[in-house]
């Protein structure tokens, strides 16, 4: 049993996969035609960020669907409380009310373009912000009420975020307020947590999305008649296994590298056959050194025999087993 877990909700939209007989199979498995190839993931993480399980969801899960996922996490892992982390969702208010009723919590993205005047004015007000020495970031918090529940609003401004927002600002977006460019606002039931801790929890959403995006390019058409839903569920299973392995490895590396850096290094760590029983591992970087150190094998060894490779794999397996004890 665990004291609490986090349920991170994310949605993904993939281009048409070109599956054989895809048109007639599009609705099989519960995918709405209007949603196209949009699906969601509900991933349960422990307090250290290691995945425990995942569920395929609709792209915008309802309060009832989220409540079912929360109940499943409690039943399967003995969690006393579940913190739901989610980005933009049209069902935020209903989900908040359901979580409050079950005694669970949330960290939700709060879109400023549709927020009330009070919240927008508070965000735009320059007072009470804590600014970094470089001036690149500033943050402030307040307690407020959402759906009759006491919440903590936390807003972060970043200079880089502002540049991106202005670059991506659409001319036809009459509702967009340039004064709010660069601001990210989240609301949470966890009023006792610091602003830094809340944004660290919210970043789980970005961390979950990153490895799945890395693998979307590998989503190739099936040569057999198959429903899109079935194909995508298989794709998400592969993504989850890769995500789980990356998380374990990055945990052993003390989270010193992001998923993209580790995945790229692993792809480059190939051995080329030289002659007879010798293989050359020519690629080396600070990231590969950290990976080998975390796996418990010799660092930066360029020449290996087949026996050396098998021995290193066995050493890495034993090292991982010891780490999990």
Predicted segment positions?
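Anion-binding and metal-coordination hotspots
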Residues: 1-325
């Amino acid at each position: 049993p665990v004291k609490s877990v986090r349920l991170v909700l994310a949605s993904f939209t993939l281009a048409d996969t070109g599956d054989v007989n895809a048109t007639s199979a599009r609705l099989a498995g519960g995918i709405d035609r209007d949603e196209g190839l949009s699906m969601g993931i509900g991933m349960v993480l422990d307090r250290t960020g290691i995945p425990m399980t995942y569920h395929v969801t609709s792209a915008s899960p309802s309060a009832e669907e989220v409540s079912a996922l929360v109940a499943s996490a409690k039943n399967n892992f003995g969690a006393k409380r579940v913190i739901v982390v989610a980005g933009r969702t049209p069902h935020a208010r209903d989900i908040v009310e359901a979580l409050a009723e079950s005694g669970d919590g949330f960290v939700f993205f709060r879109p400023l373009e549709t927020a009330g005047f009070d919240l927008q004015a508070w965000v735009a007000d320059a007072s009470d912000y804590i600014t970094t020495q470089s001036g690149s970031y500033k943050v402030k918090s307040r307690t407020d009420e959402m759906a009759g529940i006491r919440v903590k609003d936390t807003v972060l401004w970043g200079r880089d975020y502002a540049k991106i927002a202005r670059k991506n600002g659409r001319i036809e977006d009459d509702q967009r307020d340039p004064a709010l460019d660069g601001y990210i606002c989240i609301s949470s039931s966890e009023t006792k947590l610091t602003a830094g801790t809340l944004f660290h929890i919210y970043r789980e959403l970005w961390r979950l999305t990153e490895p799945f995006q890395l693998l979307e390019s590998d989503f190739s058409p099936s040569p057999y008649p198959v429903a899109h839903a079935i194909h995508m569920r298989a794709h998400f299973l592969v993504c989850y296994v890769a995500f789980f392995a990356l998380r374990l490895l990055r945990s052993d590396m003390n989270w010193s590298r992001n998923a993209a850096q580790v995945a790229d290094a692993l792809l480059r760590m190939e051995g080329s056959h030289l002659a007879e029983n010798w293989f050359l591992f020519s690629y080396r970087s600070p990231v590969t050194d950290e990976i080998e150190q975390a796996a418990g094998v010799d660092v930066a060894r360029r020449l290996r025999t087949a026996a050396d490779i098998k021995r290193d794999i066995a050493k890495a397996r034993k090292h991982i087993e010891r780490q999990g004890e």
